[in-house]
Amino acid sequence: MWFGERMRYMKIIIPKKFLNTVEEILKKNNAYSISIIEPLKTSIEDGIIITCNADARDAEKIVLELKKLGLGEKGHGSVTIMPANITFSCREEGIASTSLSPLELYYKAKTMVKITKNVIIKVILASIMGVIGLIEHNIPTLIGAMIIAPLVDTVMGSAIGTVLGDKELFIQGMKKELLCSGIVIVCAFIPSLFFVSKELVLQYLSETSIILSAIVAIIAGISGGMSIASGKEYEIIGVTIDVSILIPALLMGMALATMDLYLIYITFILLAINIVLLDVGGYIGLKYKVGKINQKIKY
C-alpha cells in the first residue's frame, strides 16, 4: 500500500464554540497540515471549517471522538474524509486564512524544537564561518554564517510554547536554544586558542553597546514572532535573530580562550540578555498575532 493511500484528508464543519475542544482532539490524534477557515456561510449557524490530514487509523479515532460532541446531529456540523493524495492545500489556493491557528503554531513549533543531525551540522558550520569572519574582520563571511545558522527556530519554538502555555514545548525549545549556543561557544573557543587575543575581543566589545544590542534582539524577536504567526517565510528576519545569538555566543567562545574573567563575564551577560529578549520579543509578536486570530474566531 502506498503511503498516500493510508493518509486521509478531513474537512470538519463545527460551531465556533467547539473549536478549542476539536483542536485538542486533533492534537491528541496526530493530525497535521491543519487550517482553520471562516467562510461567509456554512451549513450550520456560526460555523467554521477545519481541514487537516491524518493517518487512516487516526482519522477513525478523530471521527469517533467528534461523534461524542454530537457531530452529525442537526446543528452540530459534519465531517468529510477522502484520500489525502487527491486534495489540495487550502492555504496555497488562497481559501484559508493567511495566519496560522494556535494548533498550526503548535505543530510548527514541534518541528522547530527537534534536535537533528542537520541542525547540529549547520550550527557547527555557521560557527566555524562566524569565528573566521570575526578573526579576519570579514563581513561577507559573517553574513554567510548567519544565513547558514538555523538558530531562529530555537528561539521561536520556545516562544510559541510560552504563548500556547505548553510547558513541555517551552522546555524543549530552551534546551535546543542552550545546546546550539553551547555548540557555537565551543566551536569559537577552539580556533580562538590559536588566533585570538584579548585586544581583539576588547575591540569588538568596545564597538558593541549592550543597550542597542538588546533593542535589536527584542525587535528581531517581535518581527520573527509576527512573521511565523502570519504563516509567512521568516528566513530573512531569521538572519537578524542569528545576529543576536550567533555573534554574542562567538564572542563568548573567544573570550573563554583568553581566560580573562572580565571578558568572559561581559560576553556572558551580552549573550544571556539577547537570548532572554529574543524570547520576550518572540512572545510579544506571537501573542499579538494569536490574539487577533482568537478575537476573529470569538466574534
Swiss-Prot record:
Transmembrane segments: 128-148, 177-197, 210-230, 236-256, 261-281
InterPro entries, alphabetized: DUF389 (IPR005240)
Record bears the keyword Cell membrane: yes
Keyword Membrane tagged: yes
A Pfam family per the record: DUF389
Localization per Swiss-Prot or TrEMBL: Cell membrane
A Gene Ontology cellular-component term: plasma membrane
Top-level taxon: Archaea
Keywords linked to the UniProt accession: Cell membrane, Membrane, Transmembrane, Transmembrane helix
Membrane topology summary: Multi-pass membrane protein
Family, per entry: To M.jannaschii MJ0678.
Protein name, entry field: Uncharacterized protein MJ1221
Organism annotation: Methanocaldococcus jannaschii (strain ATCC 43067 / DSM 2661 / JAL-1 / JCM 10045 / NBRC 100440)
